[in-house]
Regions:
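Active-site-proximal N-terminal segment of extracellular/periplasmic enzymes that hydrolyze or transfer
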Residues: 16-64
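Beta-strand elements within well-structured catalytic alpha/beta cores of enzymes
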Residues: 28-41, 58-60, 84, 189, ...
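Secreted, luminal/periplasmic, and some membrane-associated catalytic domains
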Residues: 51, 67, 74-76, 95-142, ...
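Active-site His/acidic residue clusters
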Residues: 202-203, 207-225, 263-316, 352-354
Length: 540
């Protein structure tokens, strides 16, 4: 395998799964993956330069840092995380966003599948929860939120099957893990008899569970978009940065328990997982919120973190330090590789560039223009759209002609958005620089035009554009700007050489085969790796 990991590591005190088999070529017995969502490589560089004794500086200085790493396009949480665990981009995995459309599946609740018309929203958000207003997603725990660690490690039990799309072949609901087209590192690691765990923000992250629906033995998914207990009514855990930090801290506690050899709830001693970790959400909210805790959010100038983001970077650093300290305490530092990255970045990092555009009137106008040109057409042209700082649109007419019509219309629209100070700011071309339509959109994602999940329209926005109907956020992700894509990638610990910087371009999809290689497993067992020839990272 290209990029073979350097050196084997002598086993230290270890709570591995009984009977588990590690290859003698394995550099590590455990891989701890940390995704700091929203974090840019530039943020990491900025923080480490000013805090040379920090935990983040320890990772960078003591490991291999890839300074030109990019996440997936679209730069959304779901394709970003799926890419890190499969080695595949959206065109291969079929996962383009957390809220998309399928032309092949049937609407939720369909019982007569022979006559039902295909076409359904694929919603991988809190909307699938049995109770999206509760941090336990409807499990019914008492004493929340402090009792949240008692939440099940099998979150697909908390998904409401009546909300799921229906398979036209079997006429049965499809869970998120049924929608993923390829296998995951969890699948390969389980097949090797090793333990798996992960922690994320929605029950729908059971998409990572693989075709078996159970490849992650301990999946802890407190609902981030539930009502934030102890905060103003109507707020979820993302609308106050202190709440987001509190929420992230529950997941840190889960990972600390796993380092200690327990499951996330600390109720069963099962051994430290071979693959485990979590995502941090608090950097992302510190970038998106105009203000929180009396501090200004986002950036004060291009790439310069403002006071809220600085505070949050320090929070993440403290939590990373706690995880590293626990690994050392359990004598696992020498047998564990820590990987730091992010599902996505955030744009813009220049507050002066911000232009918030309401996409609602643009989509309404497109539907009206299509109706005027095609008066006998039934329904709206736009079947589904998701617009953050990019534009993804699925059309009810999947023809190239309809896609071309939509592209022409969007590129002809002008109007006014709002800048960082809430003043009017003009826009042209619907805030877009380029639009891929129909076959061109499929080509952009390296898939066939017949892919039932690929958007008919993929619009790349002008720098600084955020599609939102209000002024409640100052940044977003999902697009294809450097601010969306340029995330950190640091590999530290077992098998990684200290103080190494790699400046060549790499993709975060390479994390998946690298995890397997570190554990002494065959990265070619990943279907997406075989399809895309995803390289293993050269940890020198």
């Amino acid at each position: 395998v290209a990029g073979v990991i350097a050196g084997a590591v002598v086993s230290q005190a270890d709570a591995a799964t009984p009977g588990a088999h590690h290859s003698p070529q394995a550099a590590a017995k455990h891989v701890l993956l940390l995704s700091v969502d929203g974090l840019h490589q530039s943020d990491l560089t900025w923080y480490v330069a000013r805090h040379p004794q920090s935990a983040l500086a320890r990772l960078v200085g003591g490991g291999t840092e890839y300074t030109h790493a990019h996440t997936t396009t679209p730069s959304d949480s779901f394709p970003g995380m799926v890419g890190q665990f499969t080695g595949g981009d959206p065109g291969v995995t079929g996962v383009y966003y957390d809220d998309t459309w399928s032309r092949a599946l049937l609407p939720a609740g369909t019982t007569n599948c022979k006559t039902a018309k295909p076409g359904v929203e694929l919603d991988l958000t809190e909307d699938l929860d049995k109770n999206k207003n509760s941090i336990d997603a409807g499990q019914g725990l008492s004493g929340l939120p402090n009792s949240i660690l008692k939440m099940t490690g099998n979150p697909n039990a908390l998904i409401d099957p009546t909300k799921l799309p229906v398979d036209p072949k079997t006429c049965k609901p499809l869970y998120p893990y049924d929608l993923l087209r390829v296998n995951t590192v969890f699948s390969v690691i389980r097949q090797a008899g090793l333990r798996t765990a992960w922690s994320d923000k929605h029950a729908a992250y059971d998409i990572l569970d693989g075709k078996s629906g159970s490849d992650i033995q301990d999946l802890f998914t407190p609902e981030i978009n539930s009502a934030a207990i102890g905060y103003p009514a109507g707020d979820d855990w993302t609308q106050d940065n202190a709440a987001t930090e509190q929420y992230d801290s529950y997941k840190v506690r889960a990972v600390l328990n796993e380092i200690d050899g327990y499951d996330h709830s600390r109720s069963s001693h099962v051994g430290t997982p071979a693959i485990f970790g979590m995502n941090f959400q608090s950097v992302s909210t510190a970038q998106k919120l105009p203000s929180s805790e009396g501090l200004t959010g986002g950036y004060t100038a291009k790439g310069v973190p403002g006071p809220l983001l600085q505070k949050n970077l320090a929070y993440v650093d403290t939590e990373v330090g706690a995880l590293l300290a626990e690994l050392a305490k359990q004598h696992l530092a020498g047998s564990t590789t820590v990987i730091l990255s992010a599902k996505h970045g955030q744009s813009p990092t220049d507050p002066a560039a911000l232009n918030r555009i309401d996409d609602g009137p643009l989509l309404d106008g497109l539907n009206a223009a299509w109706k005027k040109a095609h008066p006998s057409y039934q329904g709206d042209l736009v079947a589904h759209a998701v617009d953050d700082d990019g534009m993804l649109i699925w059309l009810s007419d999947h023809s190239q002609q309809a896609a071309a019509f939509a592209k022409k219309y969007l590129l002809a629209q002008s109007g006014f958005g709002t800048d960082i100070n809430k003043n009017k700011r003009p826009f042209t071309r619907s805030g877009l620089t380029k639009v891929y339509a129909g076959a061109a959109a499929a080509g952009y994602f390296h898939t066939k035009a017949g892919d039932p999940n690929v958007p008919d329209i993929f619009g790349i926005s002008q720098y600084g554009v955020v599609y939102t109907g209000g002024t409640g956020k100052i940044a977003e992700h999902g697009g294809a700007h450097a601010d969306d894509l340029a995330v950190p990638l640091v590999i530290y610990g077992a098998g990684a050489e200290a103080g190494t910087r790699v400046s060549k371009h790499v993709e975060t999809t390479s994390i998946a085969p690298t995890i397997l290689t570190l554990l002494g497993l065959d990265p070619a067992k990943l279907q997406a790796v075989r399809t895309e020839h995803t390289p293993v990272l050269d940890v020198r």
